[in-house]
Amino acid sequence: EKAILKAVPHVIGRTDWDRQALAVLNPKATYHYGGEIVRDVFYEKKDRQMSKDRPVITTTISFPTYKGYDVILKVANILKNEVGLDFEWNVYGNVQPEFMEKHTGLKHENLNINLKGVASAEVLRDSLLKSTLYFHSSYVENSPNSVGEAQLVGIPVVASRVGGTDSMVEHGKTGFLYPVTDPYMAAYYIKRLIDNKEENMAIGKKAREIALVRHDKRQIVEELLDVYEQIKK
């Protein structure tokens, strides 16, 4: 990837982080902004149906270690065994838990974590609508579609402050950002959103408003066509 970035004259990106990375690796390249279209079902306006039984946290993840499954285990352990919180944490995606659970000494079965496997967009959307918040755990990231999809649904996001996530989540307004190596800070923001329903709803509403603009299909297509025209010149 570095070799390609150093060689190409034009690059499309969408975050402060990828713009700055390009400026370091290839300052002569022209940077073009280009948004991302996400899956259709997440654009639909649906009312939230937060569980009244106990808080529900949702995360979408995959098996590479840099996606932060260990972060989920550590935060869940703090919430359950140090805070004494009763919650449900649904983790979707192709998770292979054995390595990180052995490494951390923490088992998902003991921490209210449900490994749900790969799910359709509709199933994930419905799960998000019932959730108190979306949690993003990655160590390496640029512009995660999962964060954008959660924001489009209208739920607040607690995300690791890595790569380009701070271009998607405005801290305190459309979600909260935490240092990826600090599970206590992550636990604090989760508990804050659980304890303060009014703030939770307000942040979710604002997140959807911003996400609808960021992921606007027509605007993204127009911007991309404009980029192509610029490159042709």
Map each language-model feature to its residues.
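Membrane-proximal helix-turn-helix segments that form the acceptor-binding/catalytic region
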Residues: E1-H10
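Acidic anion/phosphate-binding donor-loop and adjacent secondary structure
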Residues: A23, I37-R54, E101, D126
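Conserved donor-binding/catalytic core segment of Leloir-type glycosyltransferases
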Residues: R48-K67, L73-A76, N90
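Nucleotide-activated donor-binding/catalytic signature segment of Leloir-type glycosyltransferases, i.e.
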Residues: E101-E122
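Aromatic "clamp/platform" in nucleotide-sugar-dependent glycosyltransferases that forms part
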Residues: Y139
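Short hydrophobic beta-strand element within catalytic cores of glycosyltransferases
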Residues: P156-A159
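Conserved acidic donor-binding segment of nucleotide-sugar-dependent glycosyltransferases
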Residues: H171-G172, F176-P183, R192-K197
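A short, well-ordered alpha-helix in the C-terminal region of glycosyltransferases
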Residues: M185, R192, E199-R214, I220-D226
